[in-house]
């Protein structure tokens, strides 16, 4: 299959690496600037942190997508806040099947903007974290998988087969769901409180107090209740029941949050991305606040944790200063 990975950040690089494990695939990455030069000269170098190994893949690159370029599958791994700038380019391209990978609170709107049949647009979330160094990607995962589906309906059999074929022979698990718009909004219910905590601790999760760790999960529970009030589908077994105080699911989540705060895995899986993607997190935060205006649900833990982080203006200035 001819496959394009549109975007060469951590998620796109890990995804391309997995797709290249299927030797029948011809994989191309869209990258720009110095990172494209690195990929062309040295290949796609990924340090798999948990596994203590480094992989190097040779992958073709492009820096623009022309309307007449055609691929069997296009995986878009741009941040949600960057999509408005690239959607016109993607819409004009003659490839049929697109998968938008990552946190996206506006899946339905993206699907509509692509002006294609709903069964030609999918949304996915890949379970890997990490950061990009000057010469390599550092990827943190304990096995990479993707939850994938249509915005508000299951993928067609043809689309499912195409996606499954792309990952044949790859060490990659696919989980198909029927409502990725709802799934992604539920995912933000946990991701955003975790980011608020990162910012409150200046990126050092080891400084988080027991009370703050508890607030993350209390806030996630409140967010799920808010989503229900906003008529967003919520899978209680996978979400609310894991965050409700006093439940077995909550005890497991308490242990997970503690591990993330006390081990380097938390830095690689949570802090690195939060601290390097402030603009994306602000975009997601504003989208979630927009959902809140549709309900009257009180979110005391959420607001308490959110108030402990610096303002978004301060966070952006810190990020800009660190990059100089």
Residue ranges of predicted features:
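NAD(P)+-binding Rossmann beta1-loop-alpha1 motif at the extreme N-terminus of oxidoreductases
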Residues: 1-52
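N-terminal glycine-rich dinucleotide-binding loop that anchors FAD/FMN and/or NAD(P) in oxidoreductases
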Residues: 44-61, 191
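Rossmann-like NAD(P)(H) cofactor-binding subdomain of soluble oxidoreductases
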Residues: 53-137
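Rossmann-fold dinucleotide-binding core
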Residues: 109-187
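Helix-loop-beta segment of a Rossmann-like dinucleotide-binding subdomain
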Residues: 137-151, 199-208, 264-275
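Flavin-binding catalytic cores
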Residues: 165-167, 212-237
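Active-site-proximal catalytic alpha-helix in oxidoreductases
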Residues: 181-224
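NAD(P)-dependent Rossmann-like dehydrogenase/reductase catalytic/cofactor-binding core
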Residues: 228-324
């Amino acid at each position: 299959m001819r496959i394009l990975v549109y975007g060469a950040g951590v998620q796109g690089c890990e995804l391309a690496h997995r797709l290249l494990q299927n030797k029948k695939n011809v994989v191309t990455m869209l990258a720009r600037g110095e990172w494209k030069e690195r990929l062309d000269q040295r290949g796609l170098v990924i340090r798999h942190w948990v596994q203590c190994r480094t992989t190097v893949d040779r992958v073709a690159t492009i820096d623009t997508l022309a309307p007449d370029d055609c691929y069997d599958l296009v995986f878009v791994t741009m941040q949600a806040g960057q999509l408005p700038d690239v959607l016109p380019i993607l819409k004009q391209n003659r490839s049929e099947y697109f998968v938008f990978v990552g946190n996206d609170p506006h899946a339905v709107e993206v699907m509509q903007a692509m002006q294609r049949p709903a069964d030609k647009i999918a949304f996915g979330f890949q379970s890997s974290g990490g950061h990009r160094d000057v010469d390599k990607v550092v990827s943190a995962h304990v096995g990479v998988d993707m939850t994938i589906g249509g915005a508000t309906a299951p993928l067609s059999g043809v689309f499912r087969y195409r996606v499954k074929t792309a990952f044949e022979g790859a060490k990659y698990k696919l989980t198909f769901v029927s409502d990725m718009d709802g799934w992604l909004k539920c995912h933000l219910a946990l991701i955003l409180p975790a980011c608020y905590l990162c910012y409150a601790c200046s990126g050092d999760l080891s400084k988080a107090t027991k009370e703050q760790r508890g607030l993350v999960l209390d806030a996630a529970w409140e967010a799920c209740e808010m989503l229900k009030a906003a008529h967003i589908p919520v899978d209680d077994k996978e979400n609310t029941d894991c965050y409700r105080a006093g439940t077995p699911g909550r005890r497991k989540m308490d242990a997970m949050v503690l591990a993330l705060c006390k081990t380097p895995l938390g830095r690689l899986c949570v802090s690195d991305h939060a601290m390097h993607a402030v603009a994306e997190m602000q975009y997601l935060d504003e989208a979630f606040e927009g959902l809140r205006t549709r309900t009257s649900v009180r979110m005391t833990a959420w607001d308490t944790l959110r108030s402990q982080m610096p303002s978004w203006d301060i966070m952006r200035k810190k990020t800009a200063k660190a990059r100089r």
